Regions:
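C-terminal target-recognition/interaction regions appended to catalytic cores
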Residues: 1-8, 26, 301-355
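Core alpha/beta nucleotide-donor-binding catalytic domains of modification enzymes
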Residues: 3-188, 198-204, 208
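Generic structural motif
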Residues: 86, 251-253, 343-345
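Extracellular structured ligand-interaction cores
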Residues: 25-28, 78, 241-243, 335-337
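Helix N-cap/coil-helix junction residues
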Residues: 100, 219-220, 342
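Short hydrophobic-aromatic micro-motifs
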Residues: 132, 245-248, 338-342
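Class I S-adenosyl-L-methionine
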Residues: 113-128, 138, 142-333
């Protein structure tokens, strides 16, 4: 496949990424897959700034003085889905370097997929080890209207017609985590990971309700640990992004020692699946690496005319205006980038980042 990345061009992925002899891949079922952020994190084999890497054993090879190619992990995505065609195209364009079959990605709502499975179709794969899902966040986000479970949007992206008497249901966007729970009921993975925005934590009892509902999966056979809010800056990513993570582990897949440890009020570090901070952003510890900044990441970007990356070559001529309106934010090179909004309102257009 033609490589459109300045860093990754010319790499022979088939030769680089091979499982050790006798090593079994861990099969991942991905829901709400989008363009593959969570999937890529599990798969590995991506480019990463050297300052973001806290363990040299994770490095496959240097790409240049600043950027490293990480080793591929044992995780293999065997199922992915989303309702956005552009997301599927992006996912396939990237994942094809690993030889993943395009049929793995289903352009369907999780609601429709679960319904087809209930009708007798073999929709979901067997022997799934991990289920992941960043269930839709718009109804919980501080940047949105915070409708929560009372979402005005259906599972397929269509807006409910309030004036027509439509009422919220299990199929509205704010309740799609329940359909993720149904997938867990069906495939019974050893582990599941669900992700959403930090704003969910402060929206009434939403966090507690979601944790309780996930705990009921497969007849209560899952320990769902207390959700934690993780800050990207504490893990070598130059963003202020904060996300709440739910982790559920199948009781029957655990050793007695691990089960007892995970059921304790304070889970011992040796058994805690939540990662410890590697960089000192919001965590103050002199033993941690300094935060990675935007200057570290953007400092060696080639000029558009010198890049083979089409996304770098083509850009809007719109200019930064220091007037406080939406989208008028500068990136602080010696700090962390804010979360870039995924939607906008009004007659505006995309522009290059200002730093």
């Amino acid at each position: 496949a033609e490589e459109c990345s300045d860093l990754m061009k010319g790499l022979q992925y088939e030769a680089l990424f091979k499982l050790e002899e006798g090593e079994r891949p861990l099969r991942v079922l991905s829901l709400f897959s989008g363009c593959g952020g969570m999937d890529l994190g599990l798969e590995g084999g991506f480019a990463c700034h050297a300052r973001s890497v806290s363990n040299s054993e994770w490095i496959q090879q240097p790409l240049n003085a600043q950027w490293m190619l990480l080793k591929r992990n044992r995780f293999r995505t065997v199922f992915a889905c989303d309702i956005l065609p552009a997301a599927r195209l992006t996912w396939l364009r990237y994942m094809r370097r690993f030889g993943i079959d395009p049929s793995v990605y289903h352009l369907d709502s999780v609601v429709d997929l679960v319904k087809r499975q209930a009708e007798g179709q073999a929709v979901f794969p067997s022997e799934v080890d991990v289920v992941t899902g960043g269930f839709p966040c718009q109804d919980f986000s501080l940047a949105g209207k915070r409708k929560g479970f009372d979402s005005a949007v259906s599972h397929n992206g269509e807006r409910r017609k309030a004036d027509a008497g439509d009422i919220p249901s299990e199929e509205t966007r704010g309740k799609l985590y329940m359909w993720m729970k149904q997938v867990i009921d069906i495939v019974r993975p050893k582990l599941f990971i669900a992700e959403n925005v930090k704003g969910l934590v402060s929206l009434g009892d939403v966090k507690r309700i979601i944790q309780r509902d996930f705990s009921a999966a497969n007849g209560g056979d899952y320990i769902v640990l207390d959700p934690q809010v993780l800050h990207a800056g504490n893990y070598g990513v130059p963003e202020t992004r904060e996300r709440v993570i739910f982790i559920g582990i199948k009781r029957s897949a655990l050793t007695p020692e691990a089960l007892a440890a995970l059921e304790r009020e304070q889970v011992p570090a040796a058994f805690n699946p939540y990662p410890a901070a590697t960089h000192g952003c919001t965590v103050r510890d002199p033993r941690l690496a300094r935060p990675v900044t935007c200057r570290d990441i953007f400092g060696d970007l080639p000029e558009p005319a010198e890049s083979v990356d089409l996304a770098q070559q083509n850009f809007s001529g719109a200019k930064y205006m220091d007037n406080g309106t939406q989208g008028q934010t500068e990136i602080l090179l010696d700090g962390l980038a804010p979360t870039i909004r995924s939607e906008h309102h009004g007659n505006i257009e995309f522009r290059r980042l200002s730093a």
